[in-house]
Amino acid sequence: MQQPIVGVGHSMGGCQIATLSVTSRRIFSTMILLDPAIGPPEMGLATLGLGQLTLRRRTQWLTREDAEKALRTSFSTWDPQVLDLLIKHSIHSDKQSVEMEDGPVSLVTGRYQELVNYIKPSFIRSGKVVGQELVHQTGPVDMYHMLGLVTCSTLYLCGGESTLSTPRARELWLSRTAELSYSKDPGEMRKVDERIVPDTGHFLPMEEPKECADIIADWIDKDECMIWNCHIGKQGKIWRDLSNTNRKMNAEVWIEYLQSKL
């Protein structure tokens, strides 16, 4: 794939983007993580109670109007256009009511799809549906321990009122991300920074989409892609423009240099 490639992810998506940046090293020129679900064991999924929240969340309503009213109440802080899109795409008519003008509706994504983000569905392997110990997904904690292996500049974009990106969490993210020097090329600099969107919570991209988009665009345009175009991209072009003969000659000279150093 042609660089630069920018990774952007929110919440669990931020954790997944960060994980991809480590498992597929240098796939991203930069990444922007919006309130990512990344943290040490004491901030892991087992401590957040997300499974309980999912089980309590309503998934069916008698009419589409009832569903819309409930969603507008639950997500009243969201930008109106974003909320309209949520309502448009997140509910559908139940099979028995498709032919009716109005009738029961359900969430497009049920509880199971959300629960497996938080708790491992161990019954898939064991076949034992009940009676097993609950095991929470470890992705956010795993990624926390891999933050030092990140190989691209990173922006943490956080909600000022978020209960996930607390000052302590942000301090850990900034201090640990891309910290391991052995994974850097000589002279390589990686920028790790944060931006805070005031008066927003964990759902900051849904609450203030324009402000989030402006911050992301500014980071990409003025900072990271400019750095990539001026340095990394230029270096790659120098190599690509060489003939095969010159590439081979450079490799041989490099080998001779190593022999004098090693």
Swiss-Prot record:
Motif Peroxisomal targeting signal type 1 positions after renumbering to this chain: 260-262
Induction: Expression is positively regulated by CSN5 during infection.
A cellular component term, taken from the record's GO annotations: peroxisome
Primary site of residence: other
Family: Belongs to the AB hydrolase superfamily. AKT2 hydrolase family.
More info: Gene clusters encoding host-selective toxins (HSTs) are localized on conditionally dispensable chromosomes (CDCs), also called supernumerary chromosomes, where they are present in multiple copies. The CDCs are not essential for saprophytic growth but controls host-selective pathogenicity. Although conventional disruption of ACTT2 could not be accomplished due to the high number of the copies identified in the genome, the high sequence identity among these copies of ACTT2 is likely an advantage for RNA silencing, because it allows knockdown of all copies of this gene simultaneously.
Enzyme class per UniProt: hydrolase
Phenotype of gene-disrupted mutants: Abolishes the production of ACT-toxin and impairs the formation of lesions on leaves sprayed with conidia. Does not affect growth rate of cultures, sporulation, and spore germination.
A GO term, aspect molecular function: hydrolase activity
Record keywords, A-Z: Hydrolase, Peroxisome, Virulence
Intracellular or extracellular location(s): Peroxisome
Family annotation (Pfam families): Abhydrolase_6
Pathway(s) the chain acts in: Mycotoxin biosynthesis
EC number of this enzyme: 3.1.1.-
Protein's name in the database: Abhydrolase domain-containing protein ACTT2-2
